[in-house]
Design a protein with these regions (language model features):
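Extended catalytic cores of very large enzyme megasubunits
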Residues: 1-195
Length: 195
């Protein structure tokens, strides 16, 4: 059945794509994907949906860049009276998810990178959280030159970079829409985009 999906002579059936066509239960035919998490537990792009998305990608060997900047800061109360726990608390869930999937049964080589904009209210907590609390994810700070100029946390950020706990990434736009970095910080994609 999957062979019928790729009958065109110009479609290269090599590597991951060929392996996936032969065994759709195996690794995904993509290496990397991006998910921008909305500030809601529910919904197609909410926090719970991101857990399912990340779980699926990691299970099949893809890397996932999870962008958390839309999540309200720790302690913020919304119009329903619900108090946010902030992006760092959810980062711990992604870390545990990656550890469990990577170790559960067969080793998979998917990576998980968390992203947070430098101007997010919880950026200091994000930068200074010990590696022991987020051991199975990498952390990336997304910024513009103006954000760098304005931040009071240059020292903490540089210490995080020096220790290998923090990566930096430029914020980019395409056709007036923000695009988001993938795991290796080389390709920018829309949410749920793949490379």
């Amino acid at each position: 059945m999957l062979n019928d999906l790729f009958p065109h002579p110009l479609v290269a059936r090599t590597g991951r794509i060929d392996n996936w066509i032969k065994n759709p239960e195996g690794r995904l035919p993509v290496s990397c994907t991006v998910f921008v998490v909305e500030d809601s537990i529910e919904g197609d792009n909410g926090i719970e949906a991101s857990w399912r998305f990340v779980s699926h990608a990691l299970r099949y060997g893809a890397g996932v860049a999870v962008h958390l900047s839309k999540i309200r800061p720790n302690g913020h109360t919304n119009e329903k009276g619900l108090v946010a726990s902030g992006p760092v608390s959810f980062g711990k869930v992604y870390s545990a998810l990656n550890e469990t999937i990577r170790r559960g049964g067969v080793y998979k080589n998917g990576a998980c990178v968390l992203h947070l904009d430098l101007d997010h209210a919880d950026i200091l907590e994000y930068i200074t959280t010990p590696r022991s609390e987020l051991p199975w994810v990498k952390r990336c700070v997304d910024l513009t030159p103006q954000m760098w100029k304005d931040t009071p946390y240059k020292k903490e950020l540089l210490e995080g970079i020096k220790s290998g706990d923090i990566w930096l990434n430029k914020i980019k736009y395409q056709n007036d829409q923000r695009i988001y970095s993938n795991v290796c910080l080389e390709v920018y994609l829309p949410s749920r985009g793949t490379c």
